[in-house]
Amino acid sequence: RAKTADSTTIVGRNFDWENCQAMVIRCLPDNGYASVSTANLDFFGFGDDYKPEGMINRFKAVAGVYVPMDGINEKGLVVADLMAGDNEVTNQTCDTLPDLTTTTAIRLLLNRAADVQEALALLRRYNMHSDIGTAHHLFIADAAGNSVCVEWADNRMYVTETNVLNNHYLCAAKQGITSGEESNRHEAILLRWYNENNGILTAAQMADALSEAQSMPNGTYGGTQWSVVYDLHTCSATYYWQRNFAKSYPFSVR
């Protein structure tokens, strides 16, 4: 998360995974905030040739609304899901709270939260359950420039203010536990960009930072599948697909 020279808040995000298909979804709920989000279609098993065309495939596309990996809403709230530093599964079990998974939490926040504080208040009203049997943490940022990491350890929720988040824990309960050296490399690159520019970056510089911090394919691992720069004032997203930063795909919430 950084600011531009005119104090616009921007957020950059790399999604590193196996080779996959992704879909950008504009959601316009009747009783919630409009948003643009990104779904990994491989989680649904739609197949490599899937396109949201025709009645059946368009109906399938609705599933992507509820499993976003990242997104921005019309209030300038950005939420992104990242793997944390280990495989601890969160399963909170308070009898008085409804249940939520990591990805449906992102949809809830995009629909209902205008800023970081509203997002945190919403998360505290639910039992969290990890998707795909591993540890997750969420990066949440708002148009005012607030940004936090939300993590779960021993079924407790922890909140840490931060401008940069990668694939290792920040909370005191598990601080420094990491998924590997690649996460440390990414953090070093992004912190260097942030510190050398005193936290002031253009959208183009944010894209350059994401390009430098990208992951390359290795065997069955596909590396960086998409990169996105979010503008939290215009509520827009500029995507780059599979490390091709020469071609951008702009989307707006409205």
Where are these regions (language model features)?
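C-terminal, well-structured catalytic/ligand-binding subdomain of enzymes
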Residues: 2-58, 63-65, 70-71, 80-111, ...
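Extracytoplasmic, non-cytosolic globular domains
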Residues: 123, 128, 138-141
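Acidic, contiguous internal or C-terminal segments within carbohydrate-active enzymes
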Residues: 104-116, 120-126
